[in-house]
């Protein structure tokens, strides 16, 4: 049977299931395969292939939808890729610059630490943007965007995203300039504000399910009032003390000098608890669905505090208050 006798749909299915090198060779068999079979994924490649990508190589593949050019100084222009939807142009040595993305209509862009890209406001279908660190994208550069996910951690050039009514995930870690006014009215599902001293209150976000308010975050007890979280990071946060009303909370990170204490976890039905070095929590025996417990060092949890638990994973390193775990029949990881 000649290859041209195989239905094109079948050929395309075989082609998509092949690895990268096989695809390259398969296209070169006949003019027919070269014309009709196109490699669209230049993102999920092994590092040794990614490092070899250049402008000239990419120009031979004009149907690319997914491209990873992070830390690749040999790629600076992808503007000809009219089908491109996802681009990773992160890293300080990535060659892709402002001119190199002109007229692109991406869905997802990673420009973390790329100081050559400043403006993506023309990408009206952009839904995910990573503009963290030493990225040059500033407030004007995101004007009018309707994102679903934004990472602007440690980016002091972006301070306001409150018009993005469809935004669901926001990362404003550390030196991000996004402040209280900059998130006003947002209806997020996931928010990271760890070590961000400019945001204090997220209590109106009734659909928020995951909050990271660790470290020097200014979010306090009033700032989480009424939230119905599934996952909370409050490590080293001295302003949050009580989360006992969060009946759907399944994962709690409250280690270090977190102020969350025994009363603050009363009645919770967690699956995973991190209480390393937290001397204020001493008993979790009532958490009958708890599967992972981290009670390292000066954590207050003792033998009585784990009575009857059926854990899968336990880390009680340097905690001399826990001596017997023989009753945990399903324990398979002990650290």
Question: What is each model feature region?
Answer:
Residues 327-330, 334-335:
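Low-complexity/repetitive intrinsically disordered segments
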Residues 61-65, 70, 83:
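Leucine-enriched alpha-helical scaffold segments used for protein-protein interaction
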Residues 44-50, 67-74, 88-96, 106, ...:
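Concave beta-strand-loop units of leucine-rich repeat
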Residues 23, 34, 38-59:
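Hydrophobic regular-secondary-structure patch
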Residues 1-32:
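N-terminal Skp1-binding subsegment of the F-box domain
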Residues 53-60, 75-80, 95-102, 117-122, ...:
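Short, T/G/N/S-enriched strand-turn elements that build extracellular solenoid repeat scaffolds
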């Amino acid at each position: 049977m000649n290859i041209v006798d195989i239905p094109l749909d079948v050929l395309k299915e075989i082609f998509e299931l092949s690895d990268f090198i096989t695809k390259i060779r398969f296209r070169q068999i006949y003019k027919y395969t070269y014309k009709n079979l196109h490699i669209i994924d230049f993102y999920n490649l092994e590092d040794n292939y990614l490092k070899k990508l250049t402008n000239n190589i990419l120009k031979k593949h004009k149907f690319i939808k997914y491209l990873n050019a992070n830390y690749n100084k040999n790629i600076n222009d992808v503007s000809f890729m009219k089908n491109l939807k996802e681009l990773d142009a992160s890293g300080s040595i990535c060659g892709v610059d402002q001119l190199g993305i002109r007229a692109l209509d991406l869905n997802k862009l990673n420009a973390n630490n790329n100081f050559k890209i400043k403006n993506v406001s023309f990408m009206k279908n952009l839904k995910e943007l990573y503009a963290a660190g030493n990225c040059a994208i500033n407030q004007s550069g995101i004007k009018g965007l309707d994102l679903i996910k934004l990472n602007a951690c440690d980016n002091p050039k972006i301070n306001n995203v409150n018009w993005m009514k469809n935004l669901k995930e926001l990362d404003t870690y550390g030196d991000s300039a996004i402040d209280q006014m900059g998130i006003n009215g947002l209806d997020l599902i996931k928010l990271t504000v760890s070590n961000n001293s400019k945001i204090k209150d997220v209590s109106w976000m009734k659909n928020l399910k995951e909050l990271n308010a660790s470290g020097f975050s200014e979010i306090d007890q009033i700032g989480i009032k009424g939230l119905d979280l599934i996952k909370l990071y409050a490590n080293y946060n001295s302003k949050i003390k009580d989360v006992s009303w969060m009946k759907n909370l399944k994962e709690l990170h409250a280690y270090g000098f977190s102020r969350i204490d025994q009363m603050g976890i009363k009645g919770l039905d967690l699956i995973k608890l991190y209480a390393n070095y937290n001397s204020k929590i001493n008993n979790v025996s009532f958490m009958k669905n708890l599967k992972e417990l981290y009670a390292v060092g000066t954590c207050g949890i003792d033998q009585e505090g784990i009575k009857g638990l059926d854990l899968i994973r336990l880390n009680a390193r340097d905690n001399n208050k826990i001596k017997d775990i023989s009753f945990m029949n399903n324990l398979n990881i002990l650290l």
